[in-house]
């Protein structure tokens, strides 16, 4: 049998309501030289019947007899893949028709890039467009404090996946984030600066138990990156960076600790050159401005936080402070206009 250009790996567990739409979005791609590998992680609903209902020779169905988790299922699907490229897809999302054609064209034109993702448009519980950084050096920097890739948008080269697995033994939930970090330090990674997938937001996506596991594993990846940059890592620094990553780990941001950490990260990078200095500085400026502007209760507190750490001062932060200071004047002017 002729090997396809792209192998799409779709892992499913109890998604009977959404699976058909996800599969149809892949089988309807403008690039049709593909195979769709379904790895059913011991579903107990009608997902197996839905998967088998597609009369398309490009569909290959595999089933785990017991629930092994997403990382193990993903590794199984990749092991079965025969394509030159391997695309990831979730069982509740919708790939736009030209997604694979666009991504293959990008990787063909950029042979040094190991993988690429793209922007997503959410639907369901709420709607927004998630625009991620797209240049390789920016992605490498942003992985320090975020996950700037959406897993169901990823297209990888087979050569990238051949020597790696998704760390299923160490990471049950944050395996994708750990994988992107590993790859980014060896090969360039990228995003297409356009929407390639509709990402469904619904209540059944993640349980509280799974969320706790995800945060614990994310902390492990954050610690590893901090140790690589600073030469050491401690619980307080990891907790501060975790707050920046998820913005929900604590009710109030530990601004002094975060500011101190950002200053040490910037200084360490100037010595070690782990990241492009200008790009790291820009990312830290953005994060610091967002935290100070979002959590300082008053203009005076914003100025106090900004001025106490001159090493983190930026034009962006100065503009945010001025806007906050002018807010009462704007409110008074509008009130006078309506009087």
Language-model-detected regions and their locations in the chain:
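Glycine-rich, basic loop-to-helix element that forms the pyrophosphate-binding segment
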Residues: 64-81, 102
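A conserved acidic beta->alpha catalytic loop
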Residues: 25, 32, 40-49, 66, ...
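A conserved hydrophobic helix/loop-capping motif in glycosyltransferases and polysaccharide synthases
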Residues: 6-18, 22, 29-30, 39
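C-terminal subregions of glycosyltransferases and related glycan-biosynthesis enzymes
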Residues: 201-339
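Conserved nucleotide-sugar donor-binding catalytic segment
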Residues: 79, 133-224, 228-245
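Cell-envelope/extracellular polymer assembly enzymes that use nucleotide-activated donors
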Residues: 4-7, 35, 178
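Short aromatic/hydrophobic "clamp" motif used to bind/position activated sugar donors
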Residues: 86
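Conserved donor NDP-sugar-binding/catalytic core segment of glycosyltransferases
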Residues: 98-130
């Amino acid at each position: 049998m002729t090997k396809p250009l792209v192998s799409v790996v779709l892992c499913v567990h109890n998604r009977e309501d959404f699976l058909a739409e996800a599969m149809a979005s892949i089988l309807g791609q403008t690039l049709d030289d593909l195979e769709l590998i379904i790895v059913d992680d011991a579903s107990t609903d009608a997902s197996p019947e839905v998967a088998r209902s597609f009369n398309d020779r490009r569909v290959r169905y595999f089933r785990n007899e017991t629930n092994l988790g997403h990382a193990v299922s993903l590794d199984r699907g990749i092991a079965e893949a025969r394509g030159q490229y391997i695309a990831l897809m979730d069982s509740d999302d919708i790939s736009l028709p030209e997604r694979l054609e666009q991504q293959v064209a990008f990787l063909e034109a950029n042979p040094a890039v190991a993988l690429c993702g793209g922007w997503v448009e959410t639907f369901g519980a709420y709607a927004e467009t998630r625009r991620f950084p797209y240049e390789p050096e920016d992605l490498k920097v942003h992985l320090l404090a975020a996950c700037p890739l959406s897993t169901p948008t990823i297209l990888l080269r087979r050569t990238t996946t051949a020597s790696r697995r998704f760390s299923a033994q160490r990471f049950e939930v944050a395996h994708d984030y750990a994988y992107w970090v590993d790859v980014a330090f060896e090969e360039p990674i990228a995003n297409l600066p356009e929407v390639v997938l509709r990402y469904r937001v619904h209540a059944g996506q993640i349980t509280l138990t799974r969320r706790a596991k995800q945060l614990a594993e994310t902390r492990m990846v954050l610690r590893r990156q901090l140790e690589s940059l600073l030469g050491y890592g401690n619980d307080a620094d990891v907790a501060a960076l975790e707050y920046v990553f998820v913005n929900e780990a604590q009710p109030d941001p530990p601004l002094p600790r975060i500011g101190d950490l950002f200053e040490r990260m910037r200084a360490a990078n100037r010595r070690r050159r782990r990241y492009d200095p200008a790009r790291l500085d820009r990312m830290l400026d953005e994060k610091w401005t967002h935290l100070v502007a979002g959590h300082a209760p008053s203009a005076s507190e914003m100025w106090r936080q900004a001025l106490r750490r001159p090493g983190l001062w930026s034009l962006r932060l100065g503009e945010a402070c001025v806007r906050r200071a002018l807010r009462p004047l704007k409110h008074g002017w509008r009130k006078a206009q309506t009087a």
